[in-house]
Structures are given as C-alpha cells and as structure tokens.
C-alpha cells in the first residue's frame, strides 16, 4: 500500500473510497480497532462536509513519522464558500445543513490533533492527526 493517497471528492461514492483507504492505512500502521473506527469516522465526516458544502474537493491520507512517533494524517481541502465563523462552527449543535451539529467538534474529539483554516469564498482546509499509542 502507498504511504499516501489523494482521493478526489466529486460524488457520494468517493466518501466511501476515502473511508476504505483510511481504514486500510490504519490497519497497516497498527492502529487498534477503536482507533480504526475513530479514524474512519473522522474521514467520513470531513469528506462528507466537502461533498455537502463545497460539492468537490480532495482528501489526502498519509502515514506520518515524526521522531519516534508514527501515525496518520488526513487533510481535506475544498474551494467552497468557506466558514465565516469557525468558532461558531466548532460549537456542539451548530449546523448550517439542518444536521446534528456534531461534525467538526466531533471530529476534533476523535483525533489527537485538529487544525482548520477557512477563508470566505475561497474554501476550507482541515488537517487531523492520530498517533499510535
């Protein structure tokens, strides 16, 4: 398996591909079942956001190695309308799509590191990482 893979998100089936690849990478890297589920859920949520809010974008999934730490990094990028108020978007229960509002804050809880950058009318980039314990 490659150490990184980019998946273009253009249709709902691409979300499934991103989930599958993330799970396979997590297994190869040695993550336990619970962390595999967390990683898969995070990829699902982030790629779903790309599809719902920007229609197209990409997910980059890659193995990480920093010093004696190993893990996985997921980066989602889109060129959608952006998030005007990131602080509000990170609050539990907030949603612009009539959802439960658990997406971004839930993803942050699932992963060890979470970073979001967004510019209105330019798009959003979310980077998350999970480290092997």
Model-derived segments and spans:
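Bergerat-fold GHKL ATPase/HATPase_c domain
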Residues: 1-41
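Conserved beta-strand-loop-beta-strand hairpin that lines the nucleotide-binding pocket
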Residues: 1-5, 47-133
């Amino acid at each position: 398996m490659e150490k990184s893979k980019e998946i273009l998100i253009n249709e709902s089936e691409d979300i499934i591909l991103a989930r599958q690849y993330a799970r396979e990478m997590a297994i190869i890297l040695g993550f336990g079942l619970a962390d595999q589920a967390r990683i898969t859920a995070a990829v699902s949520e982030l790629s779903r956001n790309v599809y719902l809010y920007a229609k197209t974008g990409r997910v980059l999934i890659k193995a990480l190695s920093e010093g004696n730490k190993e893990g996985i990094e997921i980066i989602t990028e889109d060129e959608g309308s952006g998030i005007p108020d990131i602080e509000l978007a990170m609050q539990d229960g907030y949603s612009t799509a009539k959802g439960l509002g658990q997406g971004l804050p839930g993803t942050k809880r699932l992963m060890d590191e979470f970073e979001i950058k967004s510019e209105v009318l330019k798009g959003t980039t979310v980077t998350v990482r999970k480290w092997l314990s």
